[in-house]
């Protein structure tokens, strides 16, 4: 029997699917629901960029697994796993967006209130591109989704939680209109909808379009 066997686990994906690789975490939980059957005590949640609104979910969990795009300073597409005290430290070391600052605050607040999960695991991927509004995950990052899920499954099994191939029904995931397949098919092209900024305000955009 494992030394640590949590009764309630939160598997959380955070980020913004509208900003290219920043959607990595959300796409991981979406994919995990499609490929693995999780027991009732494991909750899959698309946390998006909700910040402190995620606090009640952390309060309920004894263990936490977080998927996110994190700037570790490594080669783009590199997958990294951090645990426990290293999780808030790495999420705040080099902030890429407001959602990371917000999630740091969530962890700090949960710790102050005495409700922080006793085990935390961050499965992060070094992004390639974050400035493409409406863009897709880059191949180097998208290619790490299944490996990130496999790492989460290993972590869950190490905690004594049974995970099998299958599917998990959850009401806590991305809206179907923003699911990856629908998003990719329904998104307008770059010619139809500029994704690099209005040239009236962003000189770099004008140079690219010239």
From Swiss-Prot:
Chain segments annotated as coiled-coil in the UniProt record: none
Gene Ontology biological process: protein processing
Regions crossing the membrane: none
UniProt: Ni(2+) binding residues: 22, 68, 99
GO MF: aspartic-type endopeptidase activity; enzyme activator activity; metal ion binding
Superkingdom of the organism of origin: Bacteria
Classification via InterPro entries: Pept_A31_hyd_express (IPR004419), Pept_HybD-like_dom_sf (IPR023430), Peptidase_A31 (IPR000671)
This protein's UniProt keywords: Aspartyl protease, Hydrolase, Metal-binding, Nickel, Protease
PANTHER family given in the database record: HYDROGENASE 1 MATURATION PROTEASE, HYDROGENASE 2 MATURATION PROTEASE
Function: Not known. Could be involved in the processing of hydrogenase.
Similarity annotation: Belongs to the peptidase A31 family.
Full protein name: Hydrogenase expression/formation protein HupD
Organism in which the protein naturally occurs: Rhodobacter capsulatus (Rhodopseudomonas capsulata)
């Amino acid at each position: 029997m494992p030394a640590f066997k949590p009764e309630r686990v939160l598997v959380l994906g955070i980020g913004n699917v509208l900003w290219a690789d920043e959607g990595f975490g959300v796409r991981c939980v979406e994919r995990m629901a499609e490929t693995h059957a999780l027991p009732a005590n494991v909750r899959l949640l698309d946390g998006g960029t909700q910040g402190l609104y995620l606090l009640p979910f952390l309060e309920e969990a004894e263990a936490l697994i977080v998927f996110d795009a994190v700037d570790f300073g490594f080669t783009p597409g590199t997958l990294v796993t951090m645990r426990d005290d290293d999780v808030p430290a790495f999420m705040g070391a080099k902030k890429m967006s407001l959602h990371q600052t917000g999630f740091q605050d969530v962890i700090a607040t949960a710790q102050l209130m005495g409700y922080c999960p006793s085990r935390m695991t961050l499965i992060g991927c070094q992004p390639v591109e974050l400035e493409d509004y409406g863009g897709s995950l880059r191949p180097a990052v998208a290619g790490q989704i299944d490996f990130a899920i496999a790492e989460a499954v290993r972590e869950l099994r190490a905690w004594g939680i049974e995970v099998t191939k299958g599917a998990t029904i959850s009401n806590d995931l991305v809206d179907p209109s923003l699911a990856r397949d629908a998003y990719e098919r329904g998104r307008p092209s770059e010619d139809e909808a500029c994704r690099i900024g209005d040239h009236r305000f962003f000189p770099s955009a004008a140079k690219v379009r010239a």
